């Protein structure tokens, strides 16, 4: 992790950022980043220099919503993981509309920008870049609304990318694993008693039981 950006300068030397990117199989940017000018600089340099699959989440999505020019260097191996509030800022659609038309809105954003979109709702929609494929994930629980749960999803997707999955498959399978892990954790700790780390801790158990799933 590069650390939270607090100043107006890039929060780490550019050479160090390039070294981190070059040594990575996948990258996540956004969780815990903040929205300072230093965060803008980090997002800009990461987006322009990253060649490996990139998961864009949280504050990185909010910064892109404020500065769409950051997408000028977009690539098809990027995965955006917005919740409805972030999707509203990215698209200017109202949240109720996004909830009602999640499939169409995710697909439209995918088609316009050429990135995979994993729109996190009660039944998440994954619109795959460079494809007409759209997956709908039906696993999950209201417990996934916990703070930090979305960060867990980003980490799951990045882990699958590191295993060699294509971005669309990693996003779809990651959403399924995340939902099932939430169900397992909620069964153990109750809907109101779980924390994001409990969801993460349940992922290995879910993966062992889900290895035979195939995406069509």
Q: Over which residues does each language-model region extend?
A:
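Glycine-rich phosphate/dinucleotide-binding loop and adjoining beta-alpha-beta core of small-molecule
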Residues: 1-139, 208, 212-216
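Hydrophobic alpha-helical scaffolding
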Residues: 3, 7, 32-33, 147, ...
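Short, charged, surface-exposed loops that flank catalytic or proteolytic processing sites
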Residues: 95-102, 164-169, 190-194
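Short, well-structured alpha-helical segments that form the helix of a local strand-helix-strand
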Residues: 102-110, 167-181, 196-204
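Short beta-alpha connecting loops at secondary-structure transitions
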Residues: 90-91, 137-144, 154-158, 183-192
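Charged C-terminal helix
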Residues: 182-216
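Short, small-residue alpha-helix embedded
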Residues: 88-89, 143-177
